Design a protein with these regions (language model features):
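Catalytic His-Asp segment of secreted/periplasmic serine-dependent ester chemistry enzymes
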Residues: 116-117, 121-189
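Serine-dependent acyl-ester chemistry module
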Residues: 68, 74-77, 81, 111-131
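General small-molecule cofactor/ligand-binding pocket signal
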Residues: 34-36, 104, 146-148
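A short helix->loop->beta-strand "cap" motif at the edges of active sites that frequently abuts
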Residues: 94-104, 145
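Early exported N-terminus immediately downstream of N-terminal targeting peptides
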Residues: 100-103, 108-111, 121
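Conserved SGNH/GDSL esterase-like catalytic core that processes O-acyl groups on lipids
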Residues: 5-11, 15-90
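Stable alpha-helical elements in mature extracytoplasmic
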Residues: 21, 53, 57, 85-92, ...
Length: 189
């Protein structure tokens, strides 16, 4: 008898889709991956039935079976809109569990140290990393969800490896490979 293929729904934005990261994740896990993404999307949009993406996500959670649903918030959303991030994370995790799936937070990273984007954001690298770390871990703790802490991995590697695209915000191909590896490790254990 053939083993059932793992099914993963990814909810996010360009940090999820950059460099075809879901394909990298599929290669590492053998899973079928469906993505509901839009550049700049926030988790709140995934819950809004009045948006095209929200309608698709809510229908997918109601009508399809998933093993894991991966949640990725807009790049600085966990800091700039923390209360909204936590509230929407809780609502999504509830819907994910009703589906029988496991929620997984894909915790993203601080903008590149010394980069224009970080300078414009008005926060130091270590401070942004710490605030992102705290927000994602708070969301995971509150919802008893898994966490793929990519932000921590970027923080550990950033002094020795370039993981960022030229904008100092998105991952380059190496960065996306790290994303896929960190998520795969969480899903496979």
């Amino acid at each position: 008898m053939q083993e059932k293929k793992m099914r993963i729904l990814m909810l996010g934005n360009s940090f999820t889709t950059a460099n075809h990261m879901p394909d990298m994740l599929a290669d590492l896990t053998g899973a079928e991956i469906v993505q509901h993404t839009r550049g700049g999307a926030r988790l709140a949009e995934q819950l809004n039935p009045k948006t095209k993406m929200g309608k698709r996500t809510l229908e997918a959670l109601q009508n399809e079976k998933w093993d894991f649903v991966i949640l990725q918030e807009m790049s600085n959303g966990p800091i700039t809109s923390k209360a909204s991030f936590l509230e929407n994370a809780e609502k999504l995790c509830e819907k994910i569990r009703e589906n029988g799936a496991k929620p997984v937070f894909y915790a993203t990273w601080a903008y590149q140290r010394g980069g224009k984007k970080l300078e414009t954001f008005g926060m130091g690298y270590d401070e942004m990393y710490q605030k992102m770390y705290e927000a994602y871990h708070q969301a995971a703790d509150r919802t008893n969800a898994l966490i793929a802490d990519v932000g921590k991995k970027f923080y550990e590697l950033s002094d020795r490896e370039n993981l960022y695209a030229d904008d100092g915000c998105h991952p380059n191909e190496k960065g996306s490979q790290i994303v896929a590896e960190v998520i795969a490790e969480v899903l496979m254990n």
